[in-house]
């Protein structure tokens, strides 16, 4: 009687072992790129801050990385692997270095932004090294994250276009609600100057609310 009960338990254990082995096998079959995206997303999924997307709360930096990738591929469907990796890791673990840890001054803000770029590039490099990427690819990804070749490098410009479009589509309205109008117009103008004609055209097609549309029109009118 005991052996009859124990037998199914042994089969269940064997089945669990097979499932575990199957999972490991699937992981081994992932390309380096797929492994990198999975690792980047797992890191960003740890962000304690959330943002609503389609009514669902999601980790903020995970959502940001996905949106940045989406825009980058809209602008350039055949983007290089290095560019796709840089887009997905652009804000990697950003919440670990909060703005509040720096002086609330212009100098403090600039230092924070500089340190963030260094942090993101180092973090991405560590993950890519663990996966086994060649040094040349890692260097290129870090170069794009650090914006070392902007604006002369077409790939760096493409990444900047995607960053600007994510801002205009997903962050502009929130910023407009808590920023003085004249200051906001300056921010929009600075953003617009960094964008290529293709990205500007894409931005003009975004479904802005009336207030944001008016602010954008004012900013662009002053640029002419």
Predicted regions and their residues:
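Divalent metal-dependent phosphate-bond-processing catalytic cores, especially two-metal-ion Mg2+/Mn2+ enzymes
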Residues: 24, 28-38, 42, 55-62, ...
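Acidic/histidine metal-binding catalytic segments
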Residues: 76-85, 132-144
């Amino acid at each position: 009687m005991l052996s009859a009960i124990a037998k199914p338990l042994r089969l269940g254990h064997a089945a669990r072992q097979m499932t575990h082995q199957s999972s490991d096998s699937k992981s081994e079959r992932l390309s380096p790129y797929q492994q990198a995206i999975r690792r980047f997303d797992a890191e960003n999924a740890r962000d304690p801050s959330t943002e609503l997307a389609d009514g669902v709360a999601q980790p903020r930096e995970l959502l940001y990385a996905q949106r940045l990738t989406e825009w980058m591929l809209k602008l350039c469907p055949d983007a290089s692997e290095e560019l796709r990796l840089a887009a997905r890791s652009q804000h990697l673990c950003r919440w670990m270095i909060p703005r509040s840890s720096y002086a609330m001054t212009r100098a403090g803000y600039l230092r924070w932004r500089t340190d963030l770029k260094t942090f993101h590039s180092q973090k991405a490099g560590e993950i890519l090294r663990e996966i086994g990427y060649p040094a040349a690819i890692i260097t290129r990804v870090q170069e794009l994250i650090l914006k070392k070749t902007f604006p002369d490098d077409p790939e760096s410009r493409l990444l900047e276009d995607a960053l600007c479009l994510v801002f205009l589509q997903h962050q502009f309205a929130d910023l407009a609600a808590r920023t003085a109008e004249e200051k906001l117009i300056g921010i929009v103008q600075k953003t617009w100057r960094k964008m290529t004609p293709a990205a500007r055209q894409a931005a003009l097609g975004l479904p802005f609310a009336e207030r944001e549309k008016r602010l954008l029109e004012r900013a662009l009118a002053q640029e002419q």
